[in-house]
């Protein structure tokens, strides 16, 4: 076995094997890394200025791994990337590595879309979506897919239960069972390119006409477009995951101190919410909206 063969060699040989494995391990981690985080690492390598949120990523992700060192002088922090990491980053330009990165990005987009649409889904369903229309004959597709699933687990995007992939938003066995039961007897919705574009970066809402109507009502009340988007992203998640209805959403808005000027504003908001909720793709419908399935709009 590999363990026995390692025991039979000397210390210097073991050190050589370990040192030769480090670049391969680094390369694998960077190939399968979230693209936004990789861009931050490249900006650090090139000594470009980074935003406060990017500084947080460096301090939380790269400094603890020893990829980046931080130096503080006169209350200013400077980041310096290690030479070994720099060499691996430069290697990412190679064609074979680029193909692996394209594969990783594609799988990440499909994974985020499936998590958004289904909550729980079979690993076979993910594999079928990844394979559709793609040609990865020159690479070990199954091995790379398994590596990516472990990366997504480490990033706390998913967990795995048997052959099922489970969103980390599912917090209990009861919730898991409820979603599984809600899928029984239903066909899953198959995402389009539009869906993948909408959900590939982990967003919960698709900015449809129904969404835009709710957004306009909310922005009119709070006079803050960015905050309105953040609120609706959070509310959208609750519709998808927990089947929130109008009373729960209105209570949430009141908890956030959203005040409506008059009864007409409230009626306009509830009407817009009714149409939006009806059109939202949700876990309990296996990725479909209630509007698509022509179910009654009980809002």
Task: Pin down the residues of each PLM region.
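Basic helix-extension-helix modules of the SAP/HeH family
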Residues: 1-80
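Short alpha-helical segments that sit at the start of domains
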Residues: 12-36, 92-109, 207-211, 224
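Charge-enriched amphipathic alpha-helical scaffolds
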Residues: 14-15, 58-69, 133-164, 242-281
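Short capping segments at the starts of secondary-structure elements
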Residues: 46-53, 116-124, 224-226, 238-244
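Short, amphipathic alpha-helical interaction segments positioned at domain boundaries
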Residues: 82-117, 172-198
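Cys/His-clustered metal-coordination modules, chiefly Zn-binding fingers
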Residues: 295-299
